[in-house]
A protein has these predicted regions:
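Glycan-recognition and catalytic cores of secretory/periplasmic carbohydrate-active enzymes
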Residues: 1-241
């Protein structure tokens, strides 16, 4: 197992997939203050994510390095993924959820296609039992799974269902996939009363290359599990960001 082999001594000027989950705060700040710089920053981050972190085949880098000073785009790297050119499954799921949330704020129609492409990549790389491995380099074998990536992606698909017209073919795909993945998580990853557990779902992988939180419970896994359930049983559930 290895981390990135690229230079890591720049100390700054990186972006990463995880930051998509902070975008809503910038849009909210723009709405509350009336200061367009927050909205502009959010839109710029979305554009940068699309241009630099999403590859041509709709897979994703975890991080992307820019040249300090000039901010010239340099190369994609990883920290929690298997290798620089692989796709870390939870990082990719941040895109499955983050892009439709951004769409609800800025109404940019190109985000629908972007979201569809990254979501289909996620779905097309799931193993038969629908619980993703920690990195999409793996589709079988004994490598750890990451149930948190599954429930985050479910949240993203159900978010997109809210704004897609009934005529959009991906709407049915999202509904069906979300139901099947959520059922798989309940069957294979959730704990029952009386079991000795530290959370609601197991088989979360925090950072495999660093040996952190392997096949464990995690607060973010539990949170998005509950959110996924709420979204599924109550389609009118409203986000609070």
């Amino acid at each position: 197992m290895r981390i990135s082999t690229k230079p890591d001594d720049m100390g700054c000027c990186r972006t990463m997939m995880d930051t998509l989950m902070n975008i809503a705060l910038f849009y909210w700040a723009g709405e509350i203050t009336g200061d367009e710089k927050f909205t502009e920053a959010a839109n710029a981050q979305i554009k940068t994510t699309d241009n630099c972190l999403i590859r041509e085949d709709s897979s994703s880098y975890h991080h992307y390095q820019f040249e300090p000073g000039s901010l010239k785009p340099l190369y994609g790297v990883t920290w929690q993924g298997n290798r620089d050119e692989s796709t870390w499954s939870r990082g990719h799921s941040w895109g499955v959820l983050g892009f439709p949330i951004a769409y609800t704020y800025n109404g940019d129609e190109t985000l629908k296609t972007l979201h569809k492409n990254v979501t289909y990549y996620f779905l097309n790389n799931l193993p038969e039992d629908l619980i993703p491995y920690w990195d999409f380099d793996f589709t079988e074998g004994d490598e750890p799974r990451d149930s948190s990536a599954a429930v985050i992606a479910v949240c993203g698909m159900l978010e997109a269902v809210n704004y897609l017209p009934e005529t959009a073919p991906e709407k049915k795909v999202y509904k069906t996939a979300a139901a099947k993945i959520l059922e798989a998580v309940i069957d294979k990853c959730s704990y029952e009363d009386g079991e000795d557990f530290a959370g609601l779902i197991g088989h979360v992988t925090g950072a495999r290359p660093q040996g952190i939180g392997i096949d464990a419970c995690a607060v973010y896994g539990d949170y998005f599990y509950i959110e996924a359930l709420m979204r599924y049983v109550n389609p009118d559930w409203k986000r609070y960001w």
